[in-house]
């Protein structure tokens, strides 16, 4: 693997960032072409040998048919040479003509059978051989499976690979007899099957690396599962949508706790954070007054390092916080007044009790009500796999029936596969770190292969696409990266700055900026033995390079470059 690809795949600073990503064995193009050519040559030899055998069989059957016709003609001539005396004697006798008529009828029937039977036998042998030959051919298997009503379930990886292999072999070494037979027999059936199974797509892109689409839209992308051949590994964070307002957090916990320990979270649940869908926003520093979680004091609130700790850690942390002075120095002694303050705070709703109000429902409970969707934070990845196995699949996605206290409710489950966080369009194209664009505002359900499909259609020359995921749950942050192989395509994307991402039911404007890499050296003053750290990057086409602080001021002191704005990490 080249240095640029390693840098691109490890830019998050987490070793397990890419999940089961780039694990395929790298092979060189000449070796792959040689193997393909050998396989195709073997297949061509088999086809030629088979057709030669068929020609020999036809010649033998024709020679037999000619010999039998000659025998029949000789017998007819011999019958015509019968003397006239025998014919006169036969006419005189009355019962004899009936017998002769029956004999002549039988003889004519036997002759007809002799004429037809060899041809029928030879044809049956020929067609039986042909059927046996074509039943094992992969292209005929493809046609049979495409005409089947349950063809959607048969689109697996082995089948698609087999189809691609045979299609390429037919394109490189065409066989006119085979193609003519396939067109004559299956043209009508394949047209009807394709009209039913393959719907038109307005966003189709003709790319050699895109495989046959997988029609299971619930779990996978509409493009075939592209690069990961290992086991499916899910994020421990699962989106649950379609929740009515009558469903409470306790109902959600009671239902989903059968799969394992979990927490329920949604944006604005904890007012100390902007959004809990991105754990990096919260950080490790939480507010001094945190609201209770659903585990009833068995785990601290969302955002801490280990959300599944015991109650002793929370109480000890609370006592330490109350034992600290304003300056941050520990007093070391917990007085009786401090204990009463702790109990009062807990009863007020900051520790473990529910907030009380005179009117029944308090304002804090209103703030903590979900917005029609929640996030399930499971302790183990196995729980997510069990949840996915219990869901039923439809065209819109995965669904499960939530058994609440009021009535059963159909809710949507949206898991995230770690392999969907990156997509390499071509393993043989090197990645230029200067041609990587940052994509902000990416919808979280969007997969890397779908983002690559969109940018390939819009700008072209896409090499690699990555979705930014958090380090804790491996869930999408809402941003991504696109690496281009062409400078013009990259410049066009950067100059557009904003573009509307229109993909199926997603319609959102995303932002495109140059991606800033850490630990880059100044390209103006750094040499082989003197590396100067470059915290600035100039995206203008006049500069388009990394600068250290002195070089930035030096190169942008000219009035023509005053308007250049630097790109800094985190801004």
UniProtKB/Swiss-Prot annotation:
Residues annotated as domain RRM: 435-517
Organism domain of life: Eukaryota
GO biological process terms, semicolon-separated: negative regulation of cytoplasmic translation
Keyword Iron-sulfur: no
GO CC terms: cytoplasm; nucleus
Keywords: RNA-binding
UniProt cross-references to InterPro entries, sorted A to Z: CEBP_ZZ, CEBP_ZZ_sf, CPEB, Nucleotide-bd_a/b_plait_sf, RBD_domain_sf, RRM_dom
PROSITE patterns: RRM
RNA-binding recorded as keyword: yes
A single GO molecular function term of this UniProt record: translation factor activity, RNA binding
Coiled coil ranges: none
Region (Disordered): 1-23, 51-75
UniProt feature, compositional bias: Basic and acidic residues: 61-75
Entry function: Cytoplasmic polyadenylation element binding protein that binds to and regulates the translation of specific mRNAs.
Protein name in the entry: Cytoplasmic polyadenylation element-binding protein 2
Organism annotation: Caenorhabditis remanei
Taxonomy of the source species: Eukaryota, Metazoa, Ecdysozoa, Nematoda, Chromadorea
């Amino acid at each position: 693997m080249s240095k640029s690809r390693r840098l691109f795949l490890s830019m998050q600073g987490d070793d397990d960032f890419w999940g089961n990503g780039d694990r395929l064995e790298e092979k060189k193009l000449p070796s792959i072409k040689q193997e393909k050519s050998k396989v195709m040559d073997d297949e061509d030899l088999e086809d030629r040998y088979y057709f030669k055998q068929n020609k020999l069989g036809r010649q033998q059957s024709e020679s037999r048919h000619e010999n039998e016709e000659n025998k029949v003609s000789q017998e007819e001539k011999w019958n015509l040479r019968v003397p006239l005396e025998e014919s006169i004697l036969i006419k005189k006798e009355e019962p004899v003509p009936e017998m002769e008529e029956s004999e002549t009828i039988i003889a004519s029937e036997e002759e007809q059978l002799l004429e037809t039977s060899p041809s029928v036998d030879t044809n049956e042998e020929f067609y039986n051989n042909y059927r046996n030959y074509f039943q094992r051919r992969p292209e005929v298997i493809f046609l049979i499976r495409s005409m089947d009503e349950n063809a959607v379930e048969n689109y697996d990886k082995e089948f698609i690979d087999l189809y691609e292999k045979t299609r390429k072999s037919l394109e490189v070494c065409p066989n006119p007899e085979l193609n003519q037979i396939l067109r004559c027999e299956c043209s009508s059936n394949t047209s009807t099957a394709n009209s039913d199974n393959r719907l038109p797509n307005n966003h189709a892109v003709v790319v050699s690396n895109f495989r046959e689409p997988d029609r299971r839209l619930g779990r996978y992308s509409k493009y075939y599962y592209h690069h990961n051949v290992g086991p499916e590994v899910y994020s421990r964070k699962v989106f649950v949508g379609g929740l009515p307002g009558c469903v409470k957090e306790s109902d959600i916990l009671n239902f989903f706790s059968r799969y394992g320990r979990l927490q329920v979270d949604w944006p604005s649940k904890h007012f100390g954070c902007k959004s809990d869908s991105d754990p990096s926003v919260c950080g490790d520093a939480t507010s001094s007054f945190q609201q209770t979680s659903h585990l009833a004091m068995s785990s601290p609130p969302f955002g801490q390092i280990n959300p599944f700790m015991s109650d002793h850690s929370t109480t000890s942390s609370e006592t330490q916080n109350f034992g600290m002075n304003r300056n941050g120095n520990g007093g070391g002694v917990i007085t009786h007044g401090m204990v009463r303050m702790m109990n009062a705070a807990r009863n007020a709703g900051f520790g473990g009790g529910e907030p009380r109000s005179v009117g029944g429902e308090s304002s804090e409970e209103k703030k903590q009500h979900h917005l029609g969707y929640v996030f399930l934070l499971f302790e183990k990845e196995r729980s997510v796999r069990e949840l996915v196995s219990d869901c039923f699949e439809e065209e819109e996605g995965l669904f499960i029936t939530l058994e609440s206290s009021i009535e059963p409710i159909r809710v949507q489950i949206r898991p995230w596969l770690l392999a969907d966080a990156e997509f390499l369009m071509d393993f043989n194209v090197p990645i230029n770190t200067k041609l990587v664009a940052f994509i902000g505002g990416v919808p979280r359900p969007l997969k890397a292969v779908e983002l690559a499909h969109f940018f390939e259609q819009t700008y072209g020359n896409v090499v690699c696409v990555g979705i930014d995921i958090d380090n804790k749950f491996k869930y999408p942050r809402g941003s991504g990266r696109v690496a281009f192989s062409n400078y013009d395509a990259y410049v066009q994307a950067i100059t557009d700055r904003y573009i509307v991402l229109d993909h199926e039911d997603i319609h959102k404007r995303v932002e495109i900026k140059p991606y800033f890499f850490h630990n880059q050296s100044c390209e103006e003053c750094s040499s082989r033995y003197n590396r100067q750290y470059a915290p600035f990057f100039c995206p203008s086409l006049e500069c388009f390079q990394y600068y250290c602080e002195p070089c930035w001021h030096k190169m942008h002191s000219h009035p023509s470059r005053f308007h250049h704005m630097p790109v800094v990490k985190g801004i």
